[in-house]
Amino acid sequence: MFEEMIVEKVRKEAERIAEKQGLEIFDIQYRRESRGWVLRVVIDNPVGYVSVRDCELFSRELERFLDREDLIEHSYTLEVSSPGLDRPLRGPKDYQRFTGKLAKIITKDGKTFIGRIESFVDGIVTISDEKGKHEIDIEDVRKANLEIEF
């Protein structure tokens, strides 16, 4: 409960900062780990990729807010990062945004598809691999993420 309260208060300010910097909040977590409490904020750039500089500027501004508001009584580590090159795909906007990119989709019945996202229309993602095109209803997706290309 305490952790959820912290996350919600941080989320409001984080969203304000992100919007000002042309970014979005991908995820926020606050939890105890083996090394202590960690406040993890994952930022995203809706029109490209997140740079180290984006993380640095966002982190500085969020730190100022956290110091000023003194929301967290004990010591903690603030981590600001991007979703990564193998980022999860979490909904229609992601499938549309990453059309043409290599992705891995695991369905609820255990099938795995690795291929290029061809399209996303009416809740159906079309992915093509060496065997052809596959249409997958996103309601049937258990897990999906981009694959790193070399």
Curated annotation (Swiss-Prot):
GO terms for cellular component: cytosol. The keyword Cytoplasm applies. Gene3D superfamilies: RimP-like superfamily, N-terminal. It is found in: Cytoplasm. One of its GO terms (biological process) is ribosomal small subunit assembly. Its main location: cytoplasm. It holds the Pfam family RimP_N. InterPro entries: Ribosome_maturation_RimP, RimP_C, RimP_C_sf, RimP_N, RimP_N_sf. Keywords: Cytoplasm, Ribosome biogenesis. Required for maturation of 30S ribosomal subunits. Belongs to the RimP family. This is Ribosome maturation factor RimP. It comes from Thermotoga neapolitana (strain ATCC 49049 / DSM 4359 / NBRC 107923 / NS-E). The gene is rimP.
